[in-house]
């Protein structure tokens, strides 16, 4: 992936974020965040009190109240800045995507064939169902399916990957994305969406986050923060009559400062930024999530369904051995296998031809010169082969060849059955070769497990995530590869129906399931899964069924998606722990300062030895504002992620963010108090 990554603090983004932070000071914007709305209301109240004191309408220390008011406004601004900076990074990513959209004309065909009469129309006028012809050098005007032709397509504007890809009619590589460019040949495309509904439009809308909805965990946390705010608001309101009854009423300014320091302003100010940044990090991994809910669900996933080919193994199975049936020599088997593979352009087919050359110097022959007919592989027959004169040679799966042999009056040999089982036990895939009704032997196709994948699965297991390998191989082959790769379970001879049933089974047990897919046959399972990552190279049906799209079309990315989701949840939990813990230190600073005159016994709580009541209150308010700024990088980048069990992760975060949340404010407030004292700032010392 070559997409340019944004620096955490781009100067242009900082300037725009500062401007947006000021714009967010409106009551309507603040109302969306109840905790910060209370701080905003306190800022307005203390500002009005300052003006009243300056004009002599009420008695009181205008200077002290004014400074408190100023830092309360800073608290609101800093929270706005955190959110605006996160949104600005997302908008910058969206702007880069908008640059892909180009106003262009399209050749709309009057009939679904490339030689039909065409009308030049603006791309914006295309509707779902329209047929267009796109030639080399043209920008593809709409999302759609290729119904005729094949071409090399440059998708770098969408994926960031410079290497062109092949798009052609039929199969799982027929889906094209508007905004990409054809490099060679031509395509006839059936548009699958209306203007404004394209994949690119949905990417831009998601990234900009204008309609970003809060996720369930965000809503739950917001409710908790609101409840804490209400409790502290009521507690603060009751303190004034207590102090007045004691003969030394606490000022409204001090009560407002106390309330702001008590409520969880740190997480309240950073909560929205954490959610936006999580979506942005997902895009940084070249994965488009349709909503924050999908990113959050990725963090809660505890079952991963992983396709064997391309995810667990390298996906390029190679012929490794010819195992003849009893009474058949190996050269005869190799000759028949090569003939059956002459027109087979799959990596497996080419490797069979090459192995026959290497073993027996059987030179590759030409199908046309042999006057032969190639029989392609189909999902129904599960065989491919060649017809030469009266010879009918086939290669395919064991079950398919057995049915073929029996339907032609033959018998499937027991020794071949044993050879098939032996190959499968070694983790290779057996292909059986037959001529007419006579079974000639077995070809072993060896698939290589990716390096380091076993260690990654071990890390996932530590985190309580179960890994399940999905494969079309028979049970013996699947079991051998599963053992080699270190997955927890496997589903062999998988069909779309079997995958869907497995997902429903895990969900019925209360588990969250993640999977990848690229074909139309994957769509039902993708729609059922909690986290469904569709490949960008896959079909339109798969992309519409999933709640994420991997622009790199890399099935292994599913593991990274889970890591990003867990990091977002950990960041939110860690900063919530820190926010609530650091309130404790603020209690020790502000409560003795506010009530020591009325209740001298409270001086015992002044463990920090703060210089004066005014400097103690101001130090706590200043720290409360500055800590938001210091935590913005952590909120945007996410906390350090380590693959640990839930209990180990909880202990780690309590030590770092719980204990840290207790210690840091004691140090910070004391340092600010010392600075205020040394400066003799405004006589507050």
Curated annotation (Swiss-Prot):
Catalysed transformations (reactions): K(+)(out) + ATP + H2O = K(+)(in) + ADP + phosphate + H(+)
Residues annotated as binding ATP: 344, 348, 377-384, 395
CDD domains: P-type_ATPase_K
Molecular function GO terms recorded: ATP binding; ATP hydrolysis activity; magnesium ion binding; P-type potassium transmembrane transporter activity
Coiled coil, from the record: none
InterPro entries given in the database record: ATPase_P-typ_cyto_dom_N, ATPase_P-typ_P_site, ATPase_P-typ_TM_dom_sf, ATPase_P-typ_transduc_dom_A_sf, HAD-like_sf, HAD_sf, P-type_ATPase_bsu_IA, P_typ_ATPase
The EC number(s) this enzyme carries: 7.2.2.6
Taxonomy, superkingdom: Bacteria
Topological relation to the membrane, as annotated: Multi-pass membrane protein
Subunit (UniProt): The system is composed of three essential subunits: KdpA, KdpB and KdpC.
Similarity-based family: Belongs to the cation transport ATPase (P-type) (TC 3.A.3) family. Type IA subfamily.
Protein name as catalogued: Potassium-transporting ATPase ATP-binding subunit
Source organism per UniProt: Salmonella gallinarum (strain 287/91 / NCTC 13346)
């Amino acid at each position: 992936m070559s997409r340019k990554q944004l620096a955490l603090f781009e100067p242009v983004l900082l300037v725009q974020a500062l401007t947006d932070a000021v714009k967010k000071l409106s009551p309507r914007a603040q109302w969306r965040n109840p905790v910060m709305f209370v701080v905003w209301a306190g800022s307005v109240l203390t500002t009005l009190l300052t003006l009243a004191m300056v004009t002599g309408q009420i008695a009181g220390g205008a200077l002290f109240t004014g400074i408190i008011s100023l830092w309360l406004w800073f608290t609101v601004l800093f929270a706005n800045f955190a959110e605006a900076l996160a949104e600005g990074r997302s908008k910058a990513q969206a702007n880069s995507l908008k640059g892909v959209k180009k106003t262009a004309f399209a050749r709309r065909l009057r009939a679904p064939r490339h030689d039909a009469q065409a009308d030049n129309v603006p791309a914006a006028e295309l509707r779902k169902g329209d047929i267009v012809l796109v030639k080399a050098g043209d920008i593809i005007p709409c999302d759609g399916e290729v119904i005729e032709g094949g071409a090399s397509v440059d998708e770098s504007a969408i994926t960031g990957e410079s290497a062109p890809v092949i798009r052609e009619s039929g199969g799982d590589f027929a889906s094209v994305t508007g905004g990409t460019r054809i490099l060679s040949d031509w395509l006839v495309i059936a548009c699958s969406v209306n203007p404004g509904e394209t994949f690119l439009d949905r990417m831009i809308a998601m990234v900009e986050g204008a309609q970003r909805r809060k996720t369930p965990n965000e809503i739950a946390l917001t409710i908790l923060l609101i409840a804490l705010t209400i409790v502290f608001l009521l507690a603060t309101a009751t303190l004034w009559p207590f102090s007045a009854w004691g003969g030394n009423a606490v000022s409204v300014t001090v009560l407002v400062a106390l309330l702001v320091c008590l409520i969880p302003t740190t997480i309240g100010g950073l909560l929205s930024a954490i959610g936006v940044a999580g979506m942005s990090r997902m895009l940084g991994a070249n994965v488009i999530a349709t909503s924050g809910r999908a990113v959050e669900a990725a963090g809660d996933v505890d079952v991963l369904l992983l396709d064997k080919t391309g995810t667990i193994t390298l996906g390029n199975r190679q012929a490794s051995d010819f195992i003849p049936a009893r009474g058949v020599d190996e050269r005869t088997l190799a000759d028949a296998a090569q003939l059956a593979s002459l027109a087979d352009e799959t990596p497996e087919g080419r490797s069979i031809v090459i192995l026959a050359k290497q073993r027996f110097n059987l030179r590759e022959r030409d199908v046309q010169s042999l006057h032969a007919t190639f029989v392609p592989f189909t999902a129904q027959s599960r065989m491919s082969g060649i017809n030469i004169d009266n010879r009918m040679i086939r290669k395919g799966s064991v079950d398919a060849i057995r049915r073929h042999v029996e339907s032609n009056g033959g018998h499937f040999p027991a020794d071949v059955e044993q050879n098939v089982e032996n190959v499968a036990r070694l983790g290779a895939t057996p292909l059986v070769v037959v001529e007419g009704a006579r079974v000639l032997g077995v070809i072993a196709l060896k698939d290589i497990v990716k390096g380091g994948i076993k260690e990654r699965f071990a890390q996932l297991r530590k985190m309580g995530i179960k890994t399940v390998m999905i494969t079309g191989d028979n049970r013996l082959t699947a079991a051998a590869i599963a053992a080699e790769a270190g997955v927890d379970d496997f589903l062999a001879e998988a069909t779309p129906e079997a995958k869907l049933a497995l997902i429903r089974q895990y969900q019925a047990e209360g588990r969250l399931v993640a999977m990848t897919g690229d074909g139309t046959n994957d769509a039902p399972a993708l729609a059922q899964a909690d986290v469904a990552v569709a490949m960008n190279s896959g079909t339109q049906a798969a992309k519409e069924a999933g709640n994420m799209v991997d622009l790199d079309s890399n099935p292994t990315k599913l593991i990274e998606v889970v890591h990003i989701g867990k990091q977002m949840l950990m960041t939110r939990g860690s900063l919530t722990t820190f926010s609530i813990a650091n309130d404790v230190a603020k209690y020790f600073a502000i409560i003795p300062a506010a009530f020591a005159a009325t209740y001298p016994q409270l001086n015992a709580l002044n463990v920090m030895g703060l210089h004066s009541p005014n400097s103690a209150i101001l130090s706590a308010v200043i720290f409360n504002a500055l800590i938001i700024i210091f935590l913005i990088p952590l909120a945007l980048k996410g906390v350090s992620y380590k693959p640990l069990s839930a209990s180990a992760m909880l202990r780690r975060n309590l030590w770092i963010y719980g204990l840290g949340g207790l210690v840091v404010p004691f140090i910070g407030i004391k340092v600010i108090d010392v600075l205020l004292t040394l400066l003799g700032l405004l006589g507050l010392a």
